[in-house]
Amino acid sequence: SVAYTDSIPLVAALLKPVANLVGGTFQYMGWFTLVCFALQGGFGALLAGLFLPGCAAPLAADLLFVTSPVLFERVFRHTSLGAQFFVLAALYFYFAARRKGQYASRGLFALNVLAVGIHPYFLPMTYAITLALLLEYALHNRQLAGPGLYLAANFGGTALLGWALGLLYGSASSGGQALYGYFCMNLNALWNPVGVNGVLYSRVLPAQNQVYGNYDAFAYPGLGVLIALPIAVVLLRRQLGGMLRRHWALACCCAVLTVFAISNVITANGATLATLPLPASLIKLFSIFRSSGRLFWPIYYLLMLLTLVGLARLKGRWLLAGAALLAVVQVWDVSPGMVQRSAAMLQAMQTDAFPTEMESDFWQAAQQYTAVVSMDEIQDDALHLALFAADNGMTTNDPFAARYDETALAAQRETLLAELAAGTVREDTLYLFAEEGAFLQAVEPVKDNAWCGRVTSTDGTCSWYVIAPGLQGQ
C-alpha cells in the first residue's frame, strides 16, 4: 500500500485522478509543503492568540512556530512529517475546548482521522492530547459516557480511513533491522542544533555528539526559546503549580511521550548511559513507533508556548517589544540552518535527484514486463528498482516501503520459487536475485525458457542476477 511509503497516502489518493488527467506523474510534494507552512503559521497564530492579547504580539510570536527548526528539518527531507501543524492544531483545539468547558472537539476529531492519511506518527501525538482533554473533562464533571463515546468515534473514524488507504491489510511486520531504542532522543536534544548531514541551526551553540539514530529525534527549539524559557519559568513560578493541576492529564501524557521518546536506550552526547531491559514482546510492540524521538514534538511545541505564556506577563508596549525581541533572536539564530536547507534544495533542483542506473539495452528490453519481483532479499538498490517499476507501470514486491508484510512477502517468494523449480516461468515477470547461490539454484529448470545472467548498473555499483522470460537469444 502507498500508506507505507511516506507518500502522504491521503493526498496521493485524492490526486491520483489529477495524475491520470495530465497523463503522467503529478508532483504534489511542493504544494503539500506550501500548505504545511501556511497551516503552521495559521495554527501557530491561533495558539499564540489564546495567550497573548491583540494581533501584533501573537503574529510576532508566531515566528517561533513558522521558523521552527524541526519544521524546516522535516519539510526538506521527510515531507510527510512536515505537517507539524497537526501538533499545533491539536494543542489549539485542546486549549480552546478547555476554555469552553467542552470535550467533543470537532477539530480534534478531524485531526485524529486525517493524521492516519498524512503520517501515522502523528496519531499518538494527536490522540495523547485528545485523551488529556477527555480525562480532565471526565474527572472534573464526573461524566464518562460522553467522553467514552467521543473517543470511540475517533477510533472508528481513524480505522475507517486507515482501512480505505490500505493500512489495515497484512501485518506490516518488518521495516529493517532497527528496533525501538535505536532512533531514541538524546538527552542533549534541546540544545543540540545539528540536523541531518551536519546542517547547523544555530549561530551560537555548537554541534553536540550523537549516537545511533539520535539524528531522527532532532528537537532544537532555537536560541530565543532557550533564553526565554527559564525567564518564563521564573515569571510564572507562582502559577506553574496551578497550571499543572488544571492540566494534569496533559502533563501526564507529555511525561509518557517524553519517556517513550527517550526510550529504554538512554543516551547523552556520544555515550549510552544505560540500556534498560524490556521484554521482547514490548520491544516488538513499541517498534510500531520505533522512531520514538518524534513523539517529543508535543512537548517541544508546549515549551515554545510556555515562553509565550511567560511573555504575557508583560503589559502594553513591553509585551509587543518582548515578542518582537524574542522573534528577532529566534530567527537570527536558526537562519543558518534555514539557508543551508534552502541551498541544498536549490542544488537538488539543478540535477536529476535520482539518476537511473538502468539505461542499458537489457533494461530497455525489460520495460515490456508487467511485474518485477525480488526473489531472495530486499535489494540494496530498491529505490531505483521501485522508480523503474513505477515509470513503466509495473507491479513490484520491492517498493522501497518504510514497512512491509514480511509473512506475505515470504509466501509470495515461496510460490514463485516453487514455480521455477517446476520449470514454469511467468512470461510477464522479471525475476531478480541478490545472491548468486539462490539464483543458480533457481535457474537450472528454466534456463531454456528465459535469458539468465548477471546485469550490472551503468556505474558498476549495483548488480542483479536475473531471469528474464522471452529475452533468450536477444
Regions found by a protein language model. Give the residues of each.
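Membrane-interface coil-to-helix junctions
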Residues: 1-40, 68-69, 78, 193-197
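Membrane-embedded helix bundles of polyisoprenyl
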Residues: 34, 38-50, 56-98, 104-137, ...
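Membrane-interface helix-loop junctions at the exits of transmembrane helices
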Residues: 59-77, 161-171, 189-202, 251-288, ...
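Perimembrane helix-loop-helix junctions
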Residues: 124-156, 232-242
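Hydrophobic alpha-helical membrane-interfacial segments at the cytosolic entry of transmembrane helices
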Residues: 142-167, 177-182, 186, 249-256
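Signature aromatic-anchored transmembrane alpha helix within multi-pass, membrane-resident enzymes
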Residues: 152-156, 254-255, 305, 311-339
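Periplasmic/ER-lumenal interhelical loops and adjacent helix-loop junctions
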Residues: 161-234
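Extracytoplasmic
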Residues: 334-474
